[in-house]
Amino acid sequence: EQLNVTVRTRTRVASIDTHLQTVHLEGGEALPYSELVLALGAELIRPPIGGDAAEDVLGVNDLDDYRRFQDLLAAKGARKVAIIGAGLIGCEFTNDLLNGGFTVEAVDPMGWCLPTLLPEQSGRAVQAALEEKGATFHFGPLATEVNRAGEGYAVTLNNGDTIEADAVLCAVGVRPRTTLASDAGIEVNRGIVTDRQLRTNAPNVYAMGDCAEVAGHVLVYVAPLMAAARALAATLAGETTDVSYPAMPVAIKTPACPVVVSPPAKDADGEWHFEGDAPDIKALFRSGAGELLGFALTGQAVKERMALAKELPAILG
């Protein structure tokens, strides 16, 4: 009320008319706008999984999802959880569940933990730390089916192995939620396409956060969201402002083996250099000229994050 904001909870948008500058709600109500910001977030990636219990596989992307997951664990008296995916979400859940006294088996077609963020040596350090706490990993195969097996489930892998569990969690990642925008004729690529002022190709329509692809960058983390919010607030208040992304290392919540990573750009030309022994590994990605383009720190090496971040180039200067 102090900010003169009306928040409508449990309200779904059916469509957007960018020509009439109107948002249509389910139920028929139409809301005109002078400027519209799309902050649609990200949606869970659902790999193709068959079996008579495929619909029982849970994913967690919001508080309601988390409550359903916790309720299922409690209702079943679950003690063992199978996790599909060993990336950021999968590893964080693995650590949390192990701390809660659960047994965890995780499956991922890649070769080590956090494969899209960490080089192999660093990912193996995370794997070893989680295995020491009791986790079991199946790297290489895909989960193809989830079937009911007594009071629990059987997860079938494409190498013929089976994982038995009381609950199955899908944690293969998220992608920008873009359907509402694309249905309205707004340009979409990996996310809702914007320039550095967060403008889409539709007049007076902006996008920010996990749903947006800002000047070619899709960054589904908190720090980029905050930078975008500050820039867009200034623009909407009359001071046109480009968003800037400094180097923004990501802290991954795996206390068994703390991780801080600032991945190099996908097209970066260089190679990884390693210092230390697991779990305390400092991995530096340097160009041929020696410029630091990214880093991955595990264990005690995370203490160097601030000093190393100062050496990195901006993501979007």
Which positions does each model-derived feature cover?
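Glycine-centered tight beta-turn/hairpin loop motif at sheet-sheet or coil-to-beta transitions
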Residues: E26-G28, N158-G160, T254-A256, A278-P279
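Rossmann-like dinucleotide-binding cores of NAD(P)H-dependent redox enzymes
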Residues: K80-V81, L88-E145, L225, V243-A251, ...
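FAD-site-proximal beta/loop scaffold in flavoenzymes
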Residues: A53-G77, A154-T156, D161-A234
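Redox-cofactor binding/interface segments in oxidoreductases and associated redox assembly factors
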Residues: L25, L38-A39, C170, A207, ...
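Glycine-rich dinucleotide-binding loop and its adjacent helix/turn
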Residues: L40-G100
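A short, polar/charged loop-to-alpha-helix boundary motif
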Residues: A301-L316
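N-terminal Rossmann-like dinucleotide/flavin-binding domain of flavoprotein oxidoreductases
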Residues: E1-Y33, L118-T136
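Mid-to-C-terminal Rossmann-like scaffold of FAD/NAD(P)H-dependent oxidoreductases
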Residues: C211-E304
